[in-house]
């Protein structure tokens, strides 16, 4: 959720318009509320999956802290409040985009894609990529090349991020009956997919330096991060399964952790470029 709020905040702050602080604050508040609503609906629909998986069994619903019906009620109520209040506080386009994001995550991804196809996180990754577009829409009332770039950056980042997790959590997904790529096609194929998507992600991320939100600082950051991304992806791809099991997937876990910092640092660089522009130091 922290990544959702941060990327939405970046999308809002780097838009080329002046936003009243109260509008910005309420916009981020209701986007965060929408993210919380999505999480509640996800826990309701995934109660059977979360109860089996080690990394999710302590969540409120599978642990018994919150009943499934309560999670559903909370999720629906928070969704309605978040969408309506965002529309009243900012604009209808941003509210509509938030409503679509909640629906896509809670219904299309959580209830359908995750349970039916190994491409679940490829298609479903769109849900996590919308927040900066919503933030941008709060500020401008629309979309632009820059907000579409931020969407694309998260969308292309999602598969290697989650597939690297699936490499060392394969048994969890298998036990829960989730058709992750590691379960349906094996780790060798998944490693190749991590490499391919990383090769697609790197030039896209670097190209962002030449959009309206880019600049020399972003370019330097992107070159360094994507160089390291490709090194990690190649190392992950080349790994022998026996070696990976022997060291408990040390390389795969390191790549997964790096991927978290990767996205935060890219968006941090985008935000820094915007902060430097008033002083003539950001952008080209």
Curated annotation (Swiss-Prot):
Keywords of this protein's UniProt record, alphabetized?
Answer: Cell inner membrane, Cell membrane, Heme biosynthesis, Membrane, Transferase, Transmembrane, Transmembrane helix
How would you describe this protein's topology in the membrane?
Multi-pass membrane protein
User: Which CDD domains does the UniProt record give?
Assistant: PT_UbiA_Cox10
Location in the cell reads: Cell inner membrane
Keyword flag Protein transport: no
Q: What is its main location?
A: membrane
Q: Which reaction(s) are listed as its catalytic activity?
A: heme b + (2E,6E)-farnesyl diphosphate + H2O = Fe(II)-heme o + diphosphate
InterPro entries xrefs: Protohaem_IX_farnesylTrfase (IPR006369), UbiA_prenyltransferase (IPR000537), UbiA_prenylTrfase_CS (IPR030470), UbiA_sf (IPR044878)
Q: Which GO terms describe its cellular component?
A: plasma membrane
Q: Where are the transmembrane segments?
A: 2-19, 23-45, 69-89, 92-112, 121-141, 148-168, 194-214, 217-237, 263-283
Assembly and partners are described as:
Interacts with CtaA.
Q: Which family does it belong to?
A: Belongs to the UbiA prenyltransferase family. Protoheme IX farnesyltransferase subfamily.
The note filed under miscellaneous reads: Carbon 2 of the heme B porphyrin ring is defined according to the Fischer nomenclature.
Identification of the protein by name:
Protoheme IX farnesyltransferase
Q: Which organism is it from?
A: Cereibacter sphaeroides
Which gene is this protein's source?
Answer: ctaB
């Amino acid at each position: 959720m922290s990544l959702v709020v941060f990327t939405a905040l970046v999308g809002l702050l780097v838009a080329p318009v002046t936003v009243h602080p109260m509008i910005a604050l309420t916009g981020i508040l209701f986007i965060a509320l929408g993210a919380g609503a999505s999480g509640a609906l996800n826990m309701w629909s995934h109660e059977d999956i979360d109860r089996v998986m080690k990394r999710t069994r302590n969540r409120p619903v599978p642990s018994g802290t919150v009943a499934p019906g309560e999670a559903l009620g909370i999720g629906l109520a928070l969704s309605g409040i978040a969408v309506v209040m965002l529309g009243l506080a900012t604009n209808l386009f941003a509210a509509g985009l938030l409503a679509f994001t909640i629906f896509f995550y809670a219904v299309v991804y959580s209830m359908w894609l995750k349970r039916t196809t190994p491409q679940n996180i490829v298609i479903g990754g769109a849900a996590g990529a919308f927040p900066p577009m919503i933030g941008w829409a709060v500020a401008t009332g629309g979309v632009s090349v820059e907000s579409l770039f931020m969407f694309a950056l998260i969308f292309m980042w999602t598969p290697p991020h989650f597939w690297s997790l699936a490499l060392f959590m394969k048994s969890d997904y298998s036990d829960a009956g989730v058709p992750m790529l590691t379960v349906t096609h094996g780790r060798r194929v998944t490693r190749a997919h991590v490499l391919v998507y990383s090769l697609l992600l790197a030039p896209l991320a670097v190209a962002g330096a030449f959009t309206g939100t880019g600049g020399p600082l972003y370019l330097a950051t992107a070159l360094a991060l994507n160089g390291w991304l490709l090194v990690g992806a190649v190392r992950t791809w080349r790994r022998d399964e026996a070696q990976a099991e022997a060291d408990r997937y040390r390389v795969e876990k390191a790549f997964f952790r790096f991927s978290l910092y990767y996205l935060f640092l890219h968006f941090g660089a985008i935000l820094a470029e915007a902060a430097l522009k008033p002083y003539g130091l950001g952008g080209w």
